[in-house]
Amino acid sequence: MTKPFSVVLASLLAITSTISPLASAQQSQPLDRIAAIVDEDVVLQSELDRAVRNVKSQYAGRENQLPPDDVLQRQVLERLILVKLQVGRADGSGIRVSDEELNRAIASIAQQNGTTVDGLRQKLAADGMGYADFRASVRDEIIVQRLRQSFAQSRISVSEGEVDTALTQQAATGSKYHLAHILIGLPEGATAEQIATGQKKVDGVKALIDKGELDFPAAAVRYSDSPNALEGGDLGWRSLDEIPNAFAQLIRDMKPGQVAGPLRGPSGFQLLKLMEMRDANAGGEKKMVTEYNARHILVRVGDNQTEAQAKAKIDTIRARIVGGADFQATAKESSEDTNSRGQGGDLGWFPADAFGPDFGKQVEGLADGAVSEPFRTQAGWHIVQRVGSRQTDVSAENQRAQVRETIGRRKLEEEYNRYLQELRGEAYVSYRTGDRADNNATAAPAKSADPALPAPPPAKPTR
């Protein structure tokens, strides 16, 4: 089901709406103020105001779950600062988004919302947002996504042994867990005083939840230092292999609705809530796919062979085979695919989409033993002989791939959050709005150590 336009748009822009200072200044009132200086960039007050409005629009009808305006503004400003820092780091790493890529992304957003790009522009104008600002925000979101991808490719790996261990553990428990968390962050190398302050704060938050004065999502929105605080701390469905080992045993023993903690982790103190649990094997029936065994002969098109010459050559080869020549022997003699020529063109068993849609359609349309007409792909001109087909259960293979992906996701989340803390801790930040306004830019502490985070709740801490 397609989300309503306002939901998709708000989700996109709520926090990651980083606006070009020039474009924003042109569309704002006579003068736009600076909310924060971030290294060599700035967060404008208009950006901050727009992002706060977008967050509030997501909580329409649930305003009581949001913190006071000054606290919400601080949280949103910290998110905008993180986005600026990531975009700056990506720029220094050579990560770019072309206008063509940006246009495709915006067209996709419009399509998801059941409208055209022109319709999207009209909707943005009605909501008071300039199209140039919107393009800048989408560009920055894509850049941040690519920075994460680059980080994952360079730093995250999953071994076969880790997959085996996770599968064994999954078979033993057979459960998935819907979790939410609240993080009271601590900087790396926190002092005893910082640890004590964090402990007092997390105890106070836990007391509010236990007494029923705040439900867990509202407490997360108000107090959590986690990047998903404004989503109520929702972590979604996780299997045990996606949960840090320090918490996995604890969660296994919890019942839905229970809140555990405070727990001390690498990033600070955490409260965990088990929202729901379900059988991980539910609906885990076999997944059968058709695989094909085929041989092919390839004639390439290139500097030494024109399109017409290649087509004439493949026609001649096919005529020889139809006339009685052995396909395998002919492939060894004439095919220009060096990977399969030595095996008589044999490609082994493969699903239909393994070599692209055009090749797959040819194989699917043949009877066993039949030879195709010549057809063109990006590689050149082919003929293919289908040898056989079979039904294969790929559920085990898919399960391994899924587990490998979930382990990688967990590692990426842990490592990237640490990376963001380092990035934030090294940043040159000066606040120019709210109660943190100052006149001297300084190297800002990590977000978790920010002195202007919400004060501990008034409830007496409980242990």
Swiss-Prot record:
Domain PpiC: 174-276, 289-388
The UniProt record lists the keyword Signal: yes
Signal peptide (residue range): 1-25
Region described as Disordered: 329-348, 434-463
Compositional bias (Pro residues): 453-463
Subcellular location: Periplasm
EC top class named in words: isomerase
Entry-linked InterPro entries: OMP_Chaperone_SurA, PPIase_dom_sf, PPIase_PpiC, PPIase_SurA, SurA_N, Trigger_fact/SurA_dom_sf
GO cellular component: outer membrane-bounded periplasmic space
Any one GO biological process: protein folding
Keywords: Chaperone, Isomerase, Periplasm, Repeat, Rotamase, Signal
EC number: 5.2.1.8
HAMAP family referenced in this protein's UniProt entry, alphabetically: Chaperone_SurA
Domains: entry comment: The PPIase activity resides only in the second parvulin domain. The N-terminal region and the C-terminal tail are necessary and sufficient for the chaperone activity of SurA. The PPIase activity is dispensable for SurA to function as a chaperone. The N-terminal region and the C-terminal tail are also required for porin recognition.
Protein name: Chaperone SurA
Taxon lineage: Bacteria, Pseudomonadati, Pseudomonadota, Gammaproteobacteria, Lysobacterales
